[in-house]
Amino acid sequence: MNTDRKFVHDMKNMLGIVIGYSNLLLDDMPANDPRRPDVDEIRKAGEAAVALLEAWNAPPKGI
């Protein structure tokens, strides 16, 4: 596995933990919990980071 792919793989694994634990917290929080928006932002940031990594690691178009 080349260095870029290994980096993306390792980062996605770590982000998966952040997203997974965020989802667990959200599942256990009441809808009116004042911390809920903050945890949701953490989850969304993790998902955005995964999407960014996937776009960065995608093969170039048109080649």
What are these regions (language model features)?
Residues 36-63:
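Conserved DHp (HisKA) dimerization/phosphotransfer helix of two-component histidine kinases, i.e.
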Residues 26-33:
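Short acidic helix/loop segment immediately C-terminal to the autophosphorylated histidine
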Residues 5-13:
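Conserved phosphoacceptor histidine of two-component systems
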Residues 25-26, 57:
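A conserved position within tetratricopeptide repeats
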Residues 1, 19, 58:
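Extended interaction regions within the primary functional domain
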Residues 1-6, 55:
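PAS-family sensory modules
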